[in-house]
Design a protein with these regions (language model features):
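Positively charged n-region of N-terminal signal peptides that target proteins for export
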Residues: 1-4
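Sec-dependent N-terminal signal peptides
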Residues: 6-10
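N-terminal signal peptide c-region/cleavage motif recognized by signal peptidases
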Residues: 15-17
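Mature N-terminal segment immediately following signal peptide/propeptide cleavage
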Residues: 22-53
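Charge-rich, well-structured scaffold segments of protease-associated domains
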Residues: 30, 89-240
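Short, well-ordered turn and helix-capping elements at secondary-structure junctions
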Residues: 33-35, 41, 54-58, 96, ...
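Solvent-exposed loop/turn segments at secondary-structure junctions
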Residues: 43-45, 56-60, 82-83, 116-119, ...
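M16/MPP (pitrilysin/insulinase) zinc-metallopeptidase core fold and M16-derived inactive scaffolds
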Residues: 49-112, 178-182
Length: 240
């Protein structure tokens, strides 16, 4: 026992400097509207990742309107008041970038990977998503079909495709984890445009989001850009 304890102490002492060296340095601040911002500077490669995490997932949904959080993951690429419909991806990709998003029980997450000289573009695009996204009949009807096809591919036409749904409903009898993020297509079909618009107003707000910027950046310049594009976005007054 003593030898084992001594060996553990020696290994811990050896590993500690390595862990200390791998510590990731970052800076963070919060805007007056509640947006939490985390920045990490790494100038080894001329790229930057910009991401926004919204604290909304399937657990936040009305049990009669499941699938909203995942649906919005798609809808938020429809464009905004200042970005033409369907052009969000084209703009990022035309600048040499990639982008994607995902939804879980707890969060909805969007990101762009771009050359570092396009950081301002990424921040502008995410601010448009947060403040001016198009939530209208055209976008909703378009994305309904996209989500239907996704469900067919990933769930309906897959061996054991329903195993997650069946497991969750048996594991959680009361907790909102009882339904999968894909939700119910019947609920999405029954929802009104006003319900979609209210979901956007409730959850796509700065005080329900964390903005993360990592890569080839300058801290002071990046903070100024964040303030430029996000500081005037109003917070949600109602508690989330």
């Amino acid at each position: 026992m003593k030898k084992t304890t001594l060996l553990g102490l020696i290994l811990g002492w050896i590993a500690f400097p390595a862990l200390a060296q791998n510590k990731i340095e970052f800076r963070e601040f919060t805007l007056d509207n509640g947006l939490h911002v985390i920045m990490h500077q790494d100038n080894t490669t001329p790229i930057v990742v910009t991401s926004v995490l919204y604290h909304v997932g399937s657990k936040n949904e009305n049990p009669e309107r499941t699938g909203f959080a995942h649906f919005f993951e798609h809808l938020m690429f429809e464009g905004s008041e200042n970005i033409d419909r369907g052009q969000y991806m084209n703009i990022i990709q035309s600048r040499g970038g990639t982008l994607n998003a995902f939804t879980s029980n707890d969060i909805t997450y969007y990101y762009e990977l771009l050359p570092s000289n396009e950081l301002e573009l990424a921040l502008y695009m995410e601010s448009e998503r947060m403040l001016h996204s198009k939530v209208d009949i055209t976008g909703v009807e378009t994305q309904r079909e996209v989500v239907k096809e996704e469900k067919r591919q990933r769930v309906d036409n897959q061996p054991y495709g329903s195993i997650l749904t069946e497991t969750l409903v048996r594991a959680y009898s009361v907790h909102p984890y009882q339904w999968a993020p894909i939700g119910s297509l019947d609920h999405l079909n029954a929802a009104t445009i006003e319900e979609f618009q209210q979901f956007y107003k409730d959850f796509y707000v700065p005080n329900n989001a964390t903005l993360t910027i990592a890569g080839d950046i300058d801290y002071a310049q990046t903070e100024n850009l964040v303030i430029k594009y996000f500081d005037e976005i109003p917070k949600r007054r109602k508690e989330i």
